[in-house]
Regions:
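Mid-domain alpha/beta scaffold segments of enzyme catalytic cores
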Residues: 1-285
Length: 285
């Protein structure tokens, strides 16, 4: 049993075979996936909700949960009307997280100061909605300062004063940092999610982190359609391939892939306060 804790299946790359992709996931033991609600910007941040409304609850597909939020790429598009709309979407019964949000200094599609301001606002909205946050953090090639900035903002505006005391917490998705970054995130109460890039030859720092992170603080994901793992690298990614992430982590820790899948599945349901047997959310305080 596996859960893909982060995927984007709403895009055009799946228009011709989306149902088949979901069916393949279920056939490969994927119990559920989290449909990330970023879309092409604030106006389409309900894309995960629309996926859940169309496909969730059908026995041939995985269960589908959703998030809402503004990706740092689209930070320049944020406005008060969008914030209000996302708070409305956050009330949907399938929405369990706010994200992905954070900082991206690699592409810099939005100015960095704008990214920081919107990241702060998104954390405020997540607190209002009482939802955990899903963090996107990508540094530039020649600097790790995105990690320092991102973790500092989490300390100041989320975990220290709000997240740890309220129990909201968060997930560092598609982790690409160092062992030290992972330790700092764990100290802040975050889960660490590993994606297909853990299988890439040059990703030793990610593999080192995966050996250090306690199994009960770990999630796995595909980040589909991106970062297809070896042996599928270069292809369009899909949730069925999350088993390759589990296999790689299992090899690092001398455990069967199935155990990594089972443990991270339980972690997903525990973190979000969901009942595994019924896949219905428990009441939030």
């Amino acid at each position: 049993m596996y859960v893909d804790s982060h995927a984007h299946l709403e895009g055009k790359r799946y228009d011709s075979d989306r149902a088949e992709v979901l069916a393949r996931a279920k056939q490969n033991g994927i119990e559920a996936y989290l449909a990330i609600g970023n879309g092409d910007g604030p106006d389409t941040a309900d894309c995960g909700i629309r996926m859940a409304e169309k496909y969730d609850g059908k026995p041939e597909y995985p269960r589908i949960w959703a998030s809402v939020g503004i990706h740092p790429h689209e930070a320049s598009l944020a406005n008060e009307a969008a914030d209000s709309q996302m708070l409305q979407w956050a009330r949907h019964p399938r929405v369990i997280a706010w994200g992905e949000i954070g900082l991206d200094y690699f592409y810099d599609h939005s100015p960095r100061e704008t990214q920081k301001a919107v990241f702060l606002k998104q954390m405020e909205l997540a607190r209002t909605a009482k939802l955990p946050i899903i963090i996107h953090c990508r540094p530039s090639d020649n600097s790790e300062n995105a990690w320092d900035d991102c973790l500092a903002m989490i300390v100041e505006h989320w975990s220290a004063g709000h997240g740890s005391s309220s129990g909201l917490g968060g997930i560092l998705h598609c982790f690409t940092g160092s062992v030290e970054h992972a330790r700092r995130a764990l100290d802040l109460g975050f889960m660490i999610s590993f994606a297909g890039n853990i299988t890439f030859p040059k990703a030793q720092s990610i593999r080192d982190a995966a050996q250090m992170v306690p199994l009960d603080r770990m999630l796995i994901e595909t980040d589909s359609p991106y970062l297809a793992p070896i042996p599928h690298r270069g292809k369009r990614n899909e949730p069925a391939f999350v088993k390759e992430v589990a296999r790689q982590i299992g090899e690092l820790r001398n455990l069967p892939a199935e155990e990594i899948g089972s443990r991270t599945t339980q972690n997903f349901y525990n973190f979000f306060g969901l009942a595994l047997e019924t896949a219905k959310p428990e009441a939030r305080a």
